[in-house]
Each structure stands twice: as C-alpha cells, then as structure tokens.
Amino acid sequence: MTLLERTNRTVALTEAGSVLLREGRAALDAIAAADRRTRRAAQAEPGLVLVSKAGATSELLLKLLDAYAAEPGAVTVEVLLCGPGEQERLLRDGRADVALLHRPFDSVAGFDTEELHTEGQVIVLPSGHPLTAEPHLRMADVTALPGLPLPRWPGLDGTYADGPGPEVRDHAQLLQLITLGRASAVLPESVRTHLHEGLTTVPLLDAPLVTTVIAWPPHSRSRPLAALVRVATGLHTHHEPVHPNAEPSPST
C-alpha cells in the first residue's frame, strides 16, 4: 500500500495516506480524551464537567444545576464557559463530560443527545432604530441593514470569513457594538433576559428555530452523567414555531 507520492520536488499523500492521517488523528484524539476522562474519574471526589457557551441558555443552565443538586447522590458539576462553537471541541477532546449544544449551529455528530428547549430567533437592534417599532420582521428585512451589519464569528480554526460585519468573539463585545449602533444580530429569543438598556428585540417570523440539546459521548457509562441527563430531560420545553408564511395578528 502506497501512502506517499514522491517526485523530485514534492511529496504528497495518496488517498490511502489521507485516510490513514485522518483516522490516525481521530484515534489519537480519542485516546487523549479517554485519558482526561479517566483521570477525572480517578479523583478522590467524583464530579462532572459541563461546557456551555457563555451568555447562552443561562436560565436553563441554572434550572438544570439546581434540579440536579437536589438529587440524591449528586456530584459536583464544574461549569466550563466558552466562546461560540467551542463546546463541541471541548466535549470531543475530553475536557468536558457533557455539553449544551445548539442546533443547527453546533454539530452533534457522534454524540448521544436529548432535546431540552426549542425557541425562535429575534433581531437585536439599538433602541430607537425605526425597525424596533415593527411587531415582527423577516430575515430579508435584516440581512443587509444599512449601517448595522450582522457580525462575523470565528470558525473552528480561529479565522473569519470575508464580509462587511464586525469580527466578534463573545456576546458582551457584540452587544456593546449593537448599543453603539455599529451592528445588529440574529439571536435566540432567550437572549432577551440578558439585554441591558439601549437594546431592543423584534421577533423574526422565518428565522430557523434553535434547539438546545444536552450531548455526551455515546460510550459513557457514568451514573452521575446519566442522572444529570435524566434531570435535564425533565426540564424540556418547546415553543411552538411560527409558520414562515404567518402574518402577525392584530393583538401582537
């Protein structure tokens, strides 16, 4: 089997070599993740590490932690807050035992999951903007607002896609830019509980629904983790979606 193709000037992987490299990296990552989780399990006082995006699902997270702490035999849950899109990596590499992820933005491939909460999205605007007087908007109304571009978040490799919007790394930075009239943002409707004076939200009729899920490695046999997932599923809530073609009622 040939893994490399060599010439006088170049060395390139064959298809077999590319597969071996990809699978080898995955195997090494899995070993490293297993080592981290094994070391945590061997500690004198067992515990769980739960990772969540900073500024997201805070109310749900608080309810989950309080409900689990009241369970007989509950262990300590360390909360690891991270930037957007980082939860998946921290769960895969073993630095976390369980994660709160958000479909369709986070990949849940390879994880066991349970749905916890489904909600619509809103546009966050600086207070006083003309569109804040509208009862509802559509994505076409907000994707190219003059002077209020949507933000650009970093990819998993830390780089930003080209575009007119400001580069942001966290919600605090984003909300300040919106307050200053430099950006707008489409976010889950639960963001309303975190907004300060100077910001207003308007529901979006046709924005994709966001589903918060609790995710964990499929091979886990941890009883504390199973108990945490059981408690989490008991908190499941669902907001009925607004039909994309629905028009706002006079009472809204």
Describe each model-derived feature in a short phrase:
Residues 1-13:
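A short LG(V/I)-centered, amphipathic sequence patch enriched
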Residues 14-17, 90-92, 142, 176-181, ...:
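Hydrophobic residues within well-ordered alpha-helices
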Residues 16-23, 60, 64, 138, ...:
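Short amphipathic alpha-helical coupling segments at ligand-binding clamshell hinges
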Residues 29, 33-37, 42-90:
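N-terminal winged-helix
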Residues 63-67, 84-121, 198-202:
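Short beta-strand-centered segments that line the small-molecule binding cleft or hinge
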Residues 69, 80, 85-96, 171-182:
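Short helices/loops that flank or line small-molecule/ion binding pockets
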Residues 82, 96-102, 168-169, 186-188:
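Short beta-strand and adjacent tight-turn residues that come in two discontinuous sequence segments
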Residues 106, 110-182, 191-209, 238-252:
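C-terminal regulatory
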